[in-house]
């Protein structure tokens, strides 16, 4: 595990990189998800799921404002690692300072520089393996960092540049050798995150149709696989970040059941944690706290996500952009007026949508699978009565599709402008909740001041972490810009050498 720094303020962002391999635990390298926890001896304070590609991934965790000052344990593991005892999971200590409130839980010892010299913390000296092009920079000025080519064979090289305004003594915990766990066996998450949910009830039928759908402009719908009495697993793939999900469980006779999602985290609480020994200046922490409050008030940059229109690897046979047509009040009116290749039949008191079979030149005997923002609705009458002004696209997927034990004669997918099923009433057998999927390599945002107009902008830039690169493999240098926060900055390059030893080199520069 690698973090951007060792000491944080409550409310700051923590950037963490996780790497797994097969050396210690054969088979662990197949994992596509890692779990990160930040705990004290009382409770879990923050958690995150990390998406892994080729055994590596990273995440950004916002530390809660309520965290007390003290030392915390940061631990990481995969689902497959739960076959071994928890004391073998990688762990490290991090320091957190809460400058806005004092708590009885605070475990903080403020030291002077003499105590730190005795404790083994010394000032960083010039390192020929990592050098900046200058020793002193101005505000919003370009910085060039270079390092020796001797590290070209190193693995998992990570670079961070942070303001040096707080020194802490951080003793690292010892990790035990892996010992097998007795009991339940845990399979690796080879394709993606496995969501586990339990059906609530005393007398459950032997067979239930359980589904998990992600609300959005893409189709992410999964059928639950029964693993034990009332316990179902949903094997997701490619779903990342926070999503609104819809869970449903229904018996063959139509009876609805409630489901609860089970936490995938172990909740590794340490028995003891050392007190936090810290050296800092009040003025530096006040400036850092003000910078944190400004950063939280500023809107964050969000990169647009490319939408995937394929369903089961198939592109839409026909797409209707409703913004290009005369607006009607209901979806049924749109279907009748201009959507071709579909028909509306009646089955008792319910309306059923069927799609055209091109090979047979007739409408399919099986009903269509109707989706609204990725969520399946089996009562087609409700969809047909939906406000068409909310809908942007209607996608048709012709052919035959199987979902669990059910067959469908095509898919009709309605995508709304907002992608969140606005004003759509969910059925009694559905539950909607927010769920955090693994983070997919979040981007560290930093401004570039090469343009004089941007450099002269009055928009504040109080970045405490100037630069964070979870992977600088194959590079021999980077460029970035300083912020409006003056002080001493420390660059740290970390990694693993070819023979498996830890690499860590540092250098310092001033910003005035």
What are these regions (language model features)?
Residues 2, 46, 131, 380-382:
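Short, solvent-exposed loop/turn positions at domain surfaces
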Residues 3, 40, 216, 372-373:
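Structural motif
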Residues 354-397:
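Periplasmic plug
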Residues 19-26, 199:
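Short amphipathic, basic-aromatic surface patches that mediate peripheral association
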Residues 5-9, 29, 64-69, 78-343, ...:
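Surface-exposed, low-complexity/disordered segments
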Residues 35-39, 158-160, 211-213, 369-371, ...:
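Beta-strand signatures of extracellular beta-sandwich domains
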């Amino acid at each position: 595990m690698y973090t951007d720094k060792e000491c944080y303020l409550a409310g700051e962002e923590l950037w963490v990189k996780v790497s797994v391999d097969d050396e210690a635990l054969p088979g662990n390298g197949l994992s596509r998800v890692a779990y990160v926890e930040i705990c004290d001896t009382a409770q879990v304070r923050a958690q995150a799921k990390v998406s892994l590609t080729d055994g590596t991934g990273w995440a950004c965790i916002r530390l809660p404002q309520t965290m007390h000052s003290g030392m915390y344990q940061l631990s990481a593991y995969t689902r497959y690692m739960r076959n071994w005892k928890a004391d073998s999971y990688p762990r490290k200590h991090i320091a957190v300072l809460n400058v806005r409130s004092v708590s009885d839980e605070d475990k903080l010892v403020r030291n002077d520089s003499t105590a730190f010299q005795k404790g083994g913390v010394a000032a960083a000296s010039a390192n020929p393996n990592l050098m900046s092009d200058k020793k002193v920079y101005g505000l919003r000025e370009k910085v060039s960092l270079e390092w020796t080519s001797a590290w070209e064979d190193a693995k998992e090289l990570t670079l961070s540049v942070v303001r040096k305004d707080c020194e802490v003594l951080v003793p690292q915990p010892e990790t035990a050798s892996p010992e097998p766990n007795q009991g339940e066996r845990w399979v690796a998450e080879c394709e993606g995150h496995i969501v586990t949910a339990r059906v609530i009830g005393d007398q459950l039928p032997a067979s239930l149709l359980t589904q998990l759908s992600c609300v959005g402009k893409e189709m992410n719908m999964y059928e639950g696989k029964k693993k034990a009495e009332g316990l179902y697993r949903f094997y997701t793939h490619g779903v990342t970040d926070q999503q609104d999900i819809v869970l449903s469980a229904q018996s063959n006779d139509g009876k609805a059941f409630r489901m609860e999602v089970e936490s995938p985290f172990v909740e590794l609480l340490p028995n003891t944690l050392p007190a936090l020994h810290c050296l800092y200046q009040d003025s530096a922490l006040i400036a850092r706290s003000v910078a944190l409050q400004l950063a939280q008030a500023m809107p964050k940059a969000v990169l647009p996500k490319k939408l995937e229109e394929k369903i089961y690897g198939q592109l839409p046979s026909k797409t209707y952009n409703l913004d290009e047509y005369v607006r009607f009040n209901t979806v049924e009116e749109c279907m009748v007026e201009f959507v071709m290749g579909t028909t509306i039949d009646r089955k008792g008191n319910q309306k059923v949508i069927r799609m055209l079979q091109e090979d047979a030149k007739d409408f399919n005997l099986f009903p269509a699978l109707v989706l609204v923002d990725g969520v399946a609705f089996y009562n087609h009458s409700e969809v047909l009565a939906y406000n068409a002004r909310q809908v942007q696209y209607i996608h048709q997927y012709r052919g035959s599709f199987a979902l669990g034990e059910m067959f469908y004669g095509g898919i009709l997918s309605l995508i709304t402008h907002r992608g969140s099923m606005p004003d759509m009433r969910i059925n009694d057998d559905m539950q909607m909740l927010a769920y955090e999927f693994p983070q997919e390599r979040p981007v560290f945002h930093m401004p570039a001041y090469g343009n004089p107009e941007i450099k002269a902008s009055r928009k504040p830039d109080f970045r405490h972490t100037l630069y964070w690169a979870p992977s600088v493999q194959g590079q021999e240098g980077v460029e970035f810009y300083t912020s409006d926060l003056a002080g001493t900055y420390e660059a740290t390059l970390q990694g693993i050498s070819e023979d498996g030893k830890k690499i860590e080199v540092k250098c310092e520069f001033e910003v005035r």
